[in-house]
C-alpha cells in the first residue's frame, strides 16, 4: 500500500459552507418518528428474500415493537411485494394506528400499479424517489439538472392525479432525492421545493422529504451539516417532515444519524440490526437503545431483545454478530480481570444502595432492561482475575469467598485456564472449588455435638469423633462457642499449631432444606505466617463452620 497514493484515485468530500452551525450544541431529547424499511431495503439485500410467511412474521414483530410507519415493499416492481400489500389490506392486518409505506419510481405504469395495490387501505405513504446525484446524472441518466428534475416533477404530478380515488388523508406523500449526499445542496433543495409546490404541501398537510445517505460518503459531521443546511433553507420549514435514510458504508451510520437528528431531522428510516444493501442501513436498535441509555424514551419496545434477535435471524437468515451493540451475545460479557473486578464491585454497590440510577463500570445499560440476564456478564478465561471466578461462585452457587480466599482460589482457576487455553465455565469452577475445599482429607468429621456448660455460662462443651488415618478418635474441649471449642479440641488432640483468625457465613438457599456456607481463615506460624482458608457446607448452621475448620486443617 505504501507505493500507492490514494489521493490520485479518490477525492475527499468537500466541506459544507455552513456558517454558525447549530447542531453541535444540540441534544437528542425526543425520539424521532421511526419508519422500518426491513421489508423493502432489508429484504432486497438478502441472498434469499423473505417469503410471505416470513414477511408477515416480521411485520407483526415490527407492529408489536411500536413502529407506526412500516415500509412494506415496492408493489409495482415485484409480484411478491404487490401480493403482500394486498394480503395485509384484504385481511385487515394493519392496525388503525399504523401507516404502511410503499416505494415507487417516477414512471406512470409503476405509479398506477402502486395505487392499485393500496386500494382499501386506511393509511399509507406513497414514497416517490429518483436519483439526482452528480454522478448518476452523468453516468446513469446522461441528463442535465433540468432533465433529472423533470423526472421527479413528472412523477409528482402523476401521483397528484391519483389521490382523488382515495378518501382525504388516507394517502400521505414522501419524496426522496436518492443519492442526496452526492448531490449539490442547492440543486437538491431546488428539486425538493418544486415537488413540495406540486403537491401543495402546507403546515396542515406536510410532505415527508427524505434525504438519504444512499451511500455513506463522508464523516458524520458532513451529513449533519447537509441536513442543517437543508432545514434552514426550505422556504417553509413547517410544510416539511424532514426524514433521514442513512447507510453504513463507512461504519458510522449511527453516528451520522444522531448528529443529523441534532441538526433538525424529524424522522428516521432504518432496519433492525442494520440489515440492508452492502454494509447495511442504519440500525434502529442501536439508535433506540443509545437514546434509552441517555434517559430518552425511544418509543420502541426492546425489553425482549433475545426474542427480537431470534425473529430477525429467522426471517433474514443472517446472524446478529456476537459483538453487535447491545444485542450481541458477548456484549455484556467481561473476560478481563480488571473489568470483572469493577463490574462486580459496581453490581454490589447497586445492590446495597437500592439506588434507581444505573451506575456500573463497563455496562452502559442494565442487561435486564433488554431481557438479558446477569449470568453471562462475567466469564472466565486466561485473561481473567480473581473477580471472575468469585462472581460466578456468588451468582451461580451462592458461595461468597473472603477476599484472601478469592485470591488463592483464582490461582487454581488461572492455572487451568492457562494450560487449557479455553474458557472456564461456571461448572468447571465449581468442580475446582469442590476439589479445593470440599474434598475428604486425612481429617474427617464423623460425629459432633455441643452443649452449654451452664445457663449462666457462655462457654460450650463440644464432643466430636474424627476419623484420622482410618482410625476414629474422640475429642472434646470447651470454649466460647462451638467453633472456638472445636478449634481447641483439634489443636490439643492432634498437636496442631494454628489460630482461627476469621469466620463468616451465609445461607445458600431457603426453605426446609436450606444450606449454610461457612468460611474460616486460620493462621499457620510458618516463616510467612500464611493464611489457610476452609469452606464448609451443611444444612446445620452449627455444622457448616465445623466442617470449614476441618477443610482448612486438611489444606495446611
Where are these regions (language model features)?
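A mid-to-C-terminal "edge-of-domain" accessory segment
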Residues: 2-38, 295-476, 512-515
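A conserved regulatory-domain signal marking ACT and ACT-like small-molecule sensing domains
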Residues: 454-460, 467-470, 476-530, 539-540
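Alpha/beta enzyme core
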Residues: 3-4, 8-10, 34, 50-69, ...
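Short beta-alpha connecting loops at secondary-structure transitions
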Residues: 136-139, 211-213, 269-277, 289-301, ...
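Short, small-residue-enriched loops and turns at beta-alpha junctions
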Residues: 41, 45-46, 75-79, 133-135, ...
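N-terminal capping/small domains of soluble enzymes
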Residues: 1-108, 372, 377-380, 384, ...
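Catalytic alpha/beta core domains of metabolic enzymes, predominantly
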Residues: 215-352
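Mixed-charge, glycine-accented linear interaction segment located at domain edges/termini
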Residues: 529-556
Amino acid at each position: 500500500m505504501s507505493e500507492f497514493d490514494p489521493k490520485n484515485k479518490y477525492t475527499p468530500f468537500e466541506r459544507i459552507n455552513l456558517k454558525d452551525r447549530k447542531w453541535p450544541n444540540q441534544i437528542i431529547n425526543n425520539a424521532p418518528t421511526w419508519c422500518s424499511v426491513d421489508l423493502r431495503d432489508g429484504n432486497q439485500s438478502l441472498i434469499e428474500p423473505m417469503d410471505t410467511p416470513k414477511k408477515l412474521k416480521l411485520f407483526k414483530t415490527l407492529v408489536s415493537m411500536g413502529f407506526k410507519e412500516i415500509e412494506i415493499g415496492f408493489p409495482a416492481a415485484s409480484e411478491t411485494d404487490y401480493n403482500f400489500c394486498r394480503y395485509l389490506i384484504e385481511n385487515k392486518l394493519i392496525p388503525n394506528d399504523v401507516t404502511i409505506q410503499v416505494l415507487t419510481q417516477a414512471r406512470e405504469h409503476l405509479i398506477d400499479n402502486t395505487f392499485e395495490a393500496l386500494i382499501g387501505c386506511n393509511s399509507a405513504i406513497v414514497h416517490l424517489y429518483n436519483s439526482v446525484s452528480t454522478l448518476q446524472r452523468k453516468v446513469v441518466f446522461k441528463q442535465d439538472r433540468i432533465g433529472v428534475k423533470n423526472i421527479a416533477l413528472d412523477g409528482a404530478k402523476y401521483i397528484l392525479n391519483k389521490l382523488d380515488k382515495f378518501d382525504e388523508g388516507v394517502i400521505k406523500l414522501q419524496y426522496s432525492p436518492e443519492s442526496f449526499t452526492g448531490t449539490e445542496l442547492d440543486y437538491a433543495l431546488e428539486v425538493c421545493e418544486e415537488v413540495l409546490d406540486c403537491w401543495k404541501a402546507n403546515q396542515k398537510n406536510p410532505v415527508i422529504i427524505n434525504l438519504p445517505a444512499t451511500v455513506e460518503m463522508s464523516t458524520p459531521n458532513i451529513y449533519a451539516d447537509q441536513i442543517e443546511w437543508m432545514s434552514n433553507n426550505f422556504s417553509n420549514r413547517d410544510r416539511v417532515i424532514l426524514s433521514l435514510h442513512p447507510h453504513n458504508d463507512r461504519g458510522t451510520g449511527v453516528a451520522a444519524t444522531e448528529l443529523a437528528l441534532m441538526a433538525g431531522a424529524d424522522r428516521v428510516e432504518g432496519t433492525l440490526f442494520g440489515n440492508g444493501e452492502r454494509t447495511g442501513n442504519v440500525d434502529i436498535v442501536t439508535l433506540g437503545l443509545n437514546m434509552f441509555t441517555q434517559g430518552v424514551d425511544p418509543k420502541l419496545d426492546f425489553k425482549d431483545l433475545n426474542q427480537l434477535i431470534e425473529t430477525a435471524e429467522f426471517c433474514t437468515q443472517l446472524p446478529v454478530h456476537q459483538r453487535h451493540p447491545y444485542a450481541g451475545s458477548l456484549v455484556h460479557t467481561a473476560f478481563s480481570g480488571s473489568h470483572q473486578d469493577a463490574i462486580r464491585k459496581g453490581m454490589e454497590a447497586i445492590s446495597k444502595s437500592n439506588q434507581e440510577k444505573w451506575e456500573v463500570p463497563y455496562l452502559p445499560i442494565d442487561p435486564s432492561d433488554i431481557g438479558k440476564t446477569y449470568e453471562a456478564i462475567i466469564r472466565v478465561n486466561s485473561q481473567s482475575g480473581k473477580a471472575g471466578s468469585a462472581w460466578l461462585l456468588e451468582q451461580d452457587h451462592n458461595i461468597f469467598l473472603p477476599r484472601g480466599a478469592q485470591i488463592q482460589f483464582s490461582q487454581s482457576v488461572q492455572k487451568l485456564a492457562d494450560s487449557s487455553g479455553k474458557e472456564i465455565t461456571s461448572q468447571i469452577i465449581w468442580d475446582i472449588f469442590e476439589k479445593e475445599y470440599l474434598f475428604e482429607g486425612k481429617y474427617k468429621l464423623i460425629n459432633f455435638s455441643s452443649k452449654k456448660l451452664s445457663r449462666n455460662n457462655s462457654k460450650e462443651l463440644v464432643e466430636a469423633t474424627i476419623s484420622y488415618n482410618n482410625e476414629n478418635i474422640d475429642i472434646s474441649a470447651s470454649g466460647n462457642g462451638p467453633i472456638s471449642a472445636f478449634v481447641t479440641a483439634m489443636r490439643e488432640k492432634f498437636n496442631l499449631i494454628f489460630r482461627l483468625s476469621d469466620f463468616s457465613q451465609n445461607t445458600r438457599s431457603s426453605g426446609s432444606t436450606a444450606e449454610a456456607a461457612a468460611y474460616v481463615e486460620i493462621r499457620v506460624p510458618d516463616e510467612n505466617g500464611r493464611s489457610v482458608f476452609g469452606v464448609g457446607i451443611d444444612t446445620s448452621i452449627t455444622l457448616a463452620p465445623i466442617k470449614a475448620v476441618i477443610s482448612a486443617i486438611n489444606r495446611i
